[in-house]
């Protein structure tokens, strides 16, 4: 196995290669715009004109180099890596449990900052700091607080709004703990929510619960769980406000396959860890969401996040 390391950003990984399948580490310019280094190494391995499998994230430039310079037949083989990552062993499950515990603790510790007048960006910075305090190396993705209300800005993306009375604060964050990701979500209401907001919260909880409970009934696929959760929203008349898939597997990457999504026919097997994250989004009104990491077990499931899902209201 030849390991290509970006010279500027990747040299710190060298100590971790001992005892692995890697037989040679090659330093490359970051970025290697010409591809000269890795094309040379691939030729030395005798891969000119051969069949080369790549993952789905490879750049179009790299594919063209393999085809035109190396004269290789290139096919996408991500399913091989996906299948190896999908089912976690006991050590990996232990790390996922610990990381979910950390996410719960971060949520608990960030709550005192949720008050009118606080800037959202300050909260996001503090969440990142808390993850590091609890042993995470970095965020598992660019998490955010989705703050929606009458005068709020964009639904997603960098959010610099202040928290105000009558707004919802929907968390979506995670940390990287010993190479494994967490992904977490809860919603906080700033001031007493009206009946409509309470109903939205109840629907989100029901959509998640119904999907999880289906895991106890026998074999399930990502599409089956997605259909159950979306069905709850459709029946309640808020289907168009559930604007995304129900979830995704998670582990080394925050978004792994199989997805909990339409068209996903892969069976969810014991040892797989995945998110279940229904939401209701109403622009200029609210984002109500919940997200937990779930472990598929022989008898159903284990929810790795243990912190309360009860409705949370802060004084305004």
List each model region and its residues.
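Active-site neighborhoods and metal-handling regions in enzymes and metal-associated proteins
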Residues: 1-316
């Amino acid at each position: 196995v030849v390991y290509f390391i970006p010279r500027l950003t990747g040299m710190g990984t060298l100590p971790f290669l001992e005892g692995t399948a890697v037989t040679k580490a090659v330093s490359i310019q970051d970025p290697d715009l010409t591809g000269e280094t890795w094309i040379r190494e691939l030729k030395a391995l005798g891969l000119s004109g051969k069949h080369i499998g790549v993952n789905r994230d490879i750049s179009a430039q790299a594919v063209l180099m393999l085809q035109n310079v190396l004269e290789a037949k290139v096919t996408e083989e991500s399913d091989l890596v996906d299948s190896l990552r999908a089912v976690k062993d006991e050590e990996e499950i232990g790390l996922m449990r610990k990381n979910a515990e950390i996410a719960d603790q971060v949520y608990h510790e960030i709550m005192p900052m949720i008050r009118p007048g606080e800037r959202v960006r300050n909260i996001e910075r503090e969440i990142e700091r808390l993850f590091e305090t609890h042993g995470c190396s970095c965020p598992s993705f660019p998490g955010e607080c989705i703050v929606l209300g009458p005068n709020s800005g964009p639904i997603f993306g960098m959010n610099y709004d202040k928290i105000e009375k009558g707004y919802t604060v929907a968390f979506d964050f995670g940390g990287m703990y010993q190479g494994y990701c967490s992904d977490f979500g809860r919603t906080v209401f700033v001031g007493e929510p009206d009946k409509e907001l309470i109903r939205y919260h109840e629907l989100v909880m029901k959509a998640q619960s119904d999907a999880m409970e289906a895991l106890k009934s026998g074999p399930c696929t990502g599409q089956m769980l997605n259909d159950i959760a979306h069905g709850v929203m459709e029946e309640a008349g808020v289907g168009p406000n559930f604007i995304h898939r129900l979830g995704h597997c998670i582990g080394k990457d925050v978004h792994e396959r199989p997805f909990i999504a339409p068209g996903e026919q892969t069976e969810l097997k014991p040892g797989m860890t995945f998110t279940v994250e229904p939401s209701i989004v109403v622009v200029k009104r609210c984002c109500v969401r919940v997200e937990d990491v779930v472990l598929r077990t022989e008898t159903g499931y284990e929810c790795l996040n243990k912190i309360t899902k009860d409705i949370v209201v802060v004084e305004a």
